[in-house]
Amino acid sequence: MRTIVSGKRSLLIPFLIIIIALTVLTALPLSARQSKSAKPAASAQTASARNAQAASPGAKSDPSQVGSWTAPVNLGVITIHAALLHTGKILAWWYPQGTNVNSPAKLYDTVTGKTKDVTVPFPGDFFCSGHTILADGRVLVTGGLLGNPHPGVPDDGITATAIFDPGSETWSQGTPMNLARWYPTDVELPSGQTLTLTGKNEHAVIDLPMEQYDPATEVWTLLPSSANIPQQSSDTYLKMKLLTNGKVFMAGSNADTYTFDPATNRWTLTATMNFGNRYHGAAVILPGLTKVFTAGGTANHAGGGATATAEVIDLAAPAPQWSFVSPMHIPRYNSNLVILADGTLLEVGGAQTERYGTPVLIPELYDPSTDTWTEMMTQTDSRPYHSTALLLPDGTVWSAGSDDPTKKIAGHSYEIFSPPYLSKGARPTITSAPSAITYNQKFTVTTPDAASVTKVALVRPGSTTHDNDFDQRYVVLDVRHGTGKLSVTAPPSANYAPPGCTCSCW
């Protein structure tokens, strides 16, 4: 992994450098596309039926078609929150146990497999917090749970923040926010500042005001009332996606989806989802950075009745509208949607009924270019509510967590998924690449496999919890082929790739 020096808007980037060769990529023909549907589709089976079918002797097992899983390994914590650091390690944490007032946390080394205890050294329940990776690679954690000793009384949020330094592998207390927040959303802006919104306050009421954190001054600033979240879309853990025009798009949970302009501190109603309110669904901004995709979820805020539907909106269109695309094979909510190294999407985990009821063990791979879903190899441990998933630097996927009270041992585990592309040929060899790049810079990557390279992309490492990855982002770069080298052009501005740290992956 490589670190990018940060501090100026002209410097990049908290991303993985991805180089894709012809031997790694395959695609289904257009004739293999599934028909689009406005409903979950009658053919969508229950998770229990699909899980049983996948476990049968006749189930597909070719890694080049359905991928493969490692056996579960006990991490020592239930990974409700996870962030991939530029050091190649994963920071994982959950809620304090018993009378303890410190949040348990672990570091997992994705190369060696070793773990290290990094329990937060100061009091604070950072369960259901927001978090994002700052421009210098540190992890900002915002809000959490105050708790409430009175049965039947809603839990309250806190103003506390914490910062984890991957270099020293230590925690420090951050500047408190202006408002208490439990279940907030964080998004890094092109300026390198963090926009924090929603979450339940100290009275268990959802905050409408937003605030912004400047890591240079360590100051939180409340935004004017014009920036308040639209009342009809107030919810926790909103899916916020940075657009290339510098605005931020809200992709749910509510049916009405809005765009926020940081320059004017105002919201604009953009479009309404066809499914309606899509609570506990997952959403990503697709590799072209103009389309936002969402799948799964439920119309019931309390959970249950999962949908298999998926929708996409093209925000570059003159009048953007949500459109249904092919539904998943299995309805699910509280699942994780991971952008893979080749630009396809992996939907992993989730449940169909209640938070932990009828867990889905079969991941599904979605190819946006062909609008097709493909069932992958079944994983061992169920990953419904409070589970996490991250793309790792070697192109595999980490799947962990879920505090299902009936399966606490499984909840402490993690599994690693190898997507089909890792079984389709040798990876390209990178001989050299720059350790730092600036916006719109042309840089050279030397590789003996230049002629077979089909794509070069930057992938921002994820920071995820509750079916919401605050950070993942896939940016396709312009590339020109030479003899034994590639001439690559960096993104034109921080609107495409916010500043920070990066690592290499191929």
Segments from the language model and where they lie:
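N-terminal secretory signal peptides that target proteins for export/translocation
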Residues: 1-9
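Serine/threonine-biased, Pro/acidic-interspersed low-complexity stretches characteristic
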Residues: 5, 14, 29-32
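Enrichment for repetitive, rod-forming helical segments
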Residues: 9, 15-16, 43-46
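Bacterial N-terminal signal peptides
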Residues: 14-25
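Kelch-like beta-propeller repeat domains
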Residues: 29, 33-506
